[in-house]
Amino acid sequence: MKFLKNKQLGKIAMVATVSLSMLFSGTALIPSNTAYAYSSSKAQNVIQTAKKYLGTPYKYGAPSGSSRYFDCSSFTQYVFKKYGINLPRQSDEQAKVGKYVSKSNLKPGDLVFFYSPIHHVGIYIGNGKMINTYGKGGVRISDINSGTWKKNYKTARRVL
């Protein structure tokens, strides 16, 4: 009986030790390449890459892989692909990927979607702002809590 108690205590101690070491080392149980394991460092890299294209012209139906010009979904597809995340080509299809996120729980790097049916996507960068592209001016930073974006916000997805 004493042996069983010691064996059970040993298992509990081992689990507690592993859990504490994971907590303090920053190691997650979910692999970092899983679409649902949010990574703030990867999100910052995605945002920095997206910002490199500020001012890049908008062109509806821009081809995948081009960085000369973008439409909204080719932009998000292009930026995320640089970090190993393959998004579908169209915004309505991108809205089906990853994990649903409420507007109040947005984190930098989340995809934000607009209109019904969905036909616009941007990358949330924090503080109520997104980087996206449309019309004259091309890639830009917009406030999701004002004007047309506030009125037409639909959903968000986390793919990082």
Where are these regions (language model features)?
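Aromatic- and glycine-rich peptidoglycan recognition patches
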Residues: 2-8, 26-41, 45-49, 85, ...
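Sec-dependent signal peptide recognition
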Residues: 10-15
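Hydrophobic core
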Residues: 16-29
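Catalytic cysteine-centered active-site loop
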Residues: 34-43, 55-108
